Amino acid sequence: MSTQIPMDPPKFLCMPARPLVVGLAVFGAIRSFVQFWMSSGFGMAGTHFCVLLLDLLLLFGAYKNDVFALKWSQRVTFACVLIAIIRFMIYPVVFASYMASGLSRNFTGIDSEEIEILGNVTTPEQNFVFGMISGFTLEFATALSIGVESLKYLLVHRLWEYAKATEASSSSRYVIP
């Protein structure tokens, strides 16, 4: 008579955790690739490339679904959370300063609709408001990024615990003579 406790695969709300992690990793890899492709500076391209590699490692770990790969995926998602926090501290301030100072009007790679919007902003007060709104918008987006990366970390941790428990239960079958 077996007295095993049934273990259900981990879930987030009603969704299974593993397909959700795979989906988030694929979305993150695509997003990072697009940001890498469209970045103009070496520093920005480097951070996007690092996040792209980390998302691909996370995808491998979620696909492989063993204890070792999931532990490394957990470390990778922790690194992504740290990168998102660093982005949260730097990007909104730089972008808001760029917009508020009026330097954005000197950029030649913008569309005619954006030129019309920027052309109507002429006073220092309007520059300040424009910079503040753009900074808060970017701050919201980076805070959302931190939330998604933290959710991935939580899900990978649950998957790792589940894989560890199922591996331990499958290897601890005693043969009673």
Swiss-Prot record:
Main location group: membrane
GO CC entries: membrane
Tagged with keyword Membrane: yes
Localization annotation: Membrane
Topology in the lipid bilayer: Multi-pass membrane protein
Keywords: Membrane, Transmembrane, Transmembrane helix
InterPro entries documented for this protein: Glam1
Domain of life: Eukaryota
Keyword Transmembrane helix belongs to the record: yes
TM ranges: 19-39, 42-62, 76-96
PANTHER family named in the record: PROTEIN CBG09921, PROTEIN CBG22618-RELATED
Record protein name field: Glia associated membrane protein glam-1
Species lineage: Eukaryota, Metazoa, Ecdysozoa, Nematoda, Chromadorea
